[in-house]
């Protein structure tokens, strides 16, 4: 089991903490989530601390990321989505840094665990629900009955739409966790296989590993984007009642 590709996902307690009968121990997952947050804050602090008319490369890169998220909100929600920029931007950056941090050797990918991704998805789900009821009141419930639905079909459609709505945080969290775990497992397996091939082919298999790492970095960025854009679409449903 020492060579199992799943060992990299093991949760290890570093500081055992019990509060009110609950286990809130500080783990390797906690460290990497804290590290991802610290790196993100440091990056944007350095980028915007001393803003210049002629921006530095660091400032340009940070502005590109910020404008990317703002454009995502504008395209999916419109001007009404401006107030959600802090939430959506923080969500995207946190997932992105957790995903990329997990690509470093001997690190830990916090977003490969369903408890982490489900917590993020639940945050979006609760926000969408609360915003929907605040903005539309009980009319928000019309979201579960598409316009033009025949009366005889209405009960079935309400059940289906309600089930679909409740399944959103589950599918959102599973998609991110499953993709991050699958990618890391595949990379671990192929890397081990490549080491064996090097006995016979010398350094020829190394380009394969480089390509796979590049692809996994692309997937890490893509999954952060998918999670965020789906969150924007859910917010749009609540705000514009689609």
Curated annotation (Swiss-Prot):
Chain ranges passing through the membrane: 29-49, 84-104, 114-134, 140-160, 181-201, 203-223
HAMAP family: ATP_synth_a_bact
Predominant location: membrane
Similarity comment: family membership: Belongs to the ATPase A chain family.
InterPro entries (alphabetical): ATP_synth_F0_asu, ATP_synth_F0_asu_AS, ATP_synth_F0_asu_bact/mt, F0_ATP_A_sf
Quaternary assembly: F-type ATPases have 2 components, CF(1) - the catalytic core - and CF(0) - the membrane proton channel. CF(1) has five subunits: alpha(3), beta(3), gamma(1), delta(1), epsilon(1). CF(0) has three main subunits: a(1), b(2) and c(9-12). The alpha and beta chains form an alternating ring which encloses part of the gamma chain. CF(1) is attached to CF(0) by a central stalk formed by the gamma and epsilon chains, while a peripheral stalk is formed by the delta and b chains.
Pfam (any one): ATP-synt_A
SUPFAM superfamilies xrefs: F1F0 ATP synthase subunit A
Protein name: ATP synthase subunit a
MF (Gene Ontology): proton-transporting ATP synthase activity, rotational mechanism
NCBIfam families: ATP_synt_6_or_A, PRK05815.2-4
Record localization: Cell inner membrane
Function comment: Key component of the proton channel; it plays a direct role in the translocation of protons across the membrane.
A cellular component term, taken from the record's GO annotations: proton-transporting ATP synthase complex
Keywords for the protein's UniProt record, in alphabetical order: ATP synthesis, Cell inner membrane, Cell membrane, CF(0), Hydrogen ion transport, Ion transport, Membrane, Transmembrane, Transmembrane helix, Transport
Membrane topology classification: Multi-pass membrane protein
């Amino acid at each position: 089991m020492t060579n199992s590709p799943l060992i990299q996902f093991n949760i290890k307690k570093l500081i055992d903490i019990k509060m009110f009968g609950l286990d809130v121990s500080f783990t390797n997952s906690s460290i990497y989530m804290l590290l991802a947050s610290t790196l993100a804050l440091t990056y944007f602090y350095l980028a915007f601390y001393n803003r210049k008319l002629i921006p530095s490369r660091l400032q340009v890169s940070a502005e590109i990321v910020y404008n990317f998220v703002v454009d995502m909100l504008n395209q999916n929600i419109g001007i009404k989505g401006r107030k959600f920029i802090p939430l959506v931007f923080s969500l995207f950056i946190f997932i992105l840094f957790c995903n990329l941090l997990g690509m470093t050797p001997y690190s830990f990918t916090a977003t490969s665990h369903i408890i982490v991704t489900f917590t993020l998805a639940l945050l979006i789900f609760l926000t969408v629900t609360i915003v929907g009821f605040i903005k539309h009141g009980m009319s928000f419930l019309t979201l579960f009955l598409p316009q033009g639905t025949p009366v005889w079909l209405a009960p079935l459609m309400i059940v289906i739409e309600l089930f679909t709505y409740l399944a959103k945080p589950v599918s959102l969290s599973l998609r991110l966790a499953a993709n991050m775990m699958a990618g890391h497992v595949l990379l671990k397996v192929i890397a081990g296989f490549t080491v064996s091939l090097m006995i016979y082919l010398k350094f020829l298999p190394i380009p394969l590993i480089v390509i796979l790492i590049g692809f996994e970095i692309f997937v890490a960025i893509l999954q952060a984007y998918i999670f965020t854009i789906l969150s924007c679409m859910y917010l749009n449903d609540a705000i514009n009642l689609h």
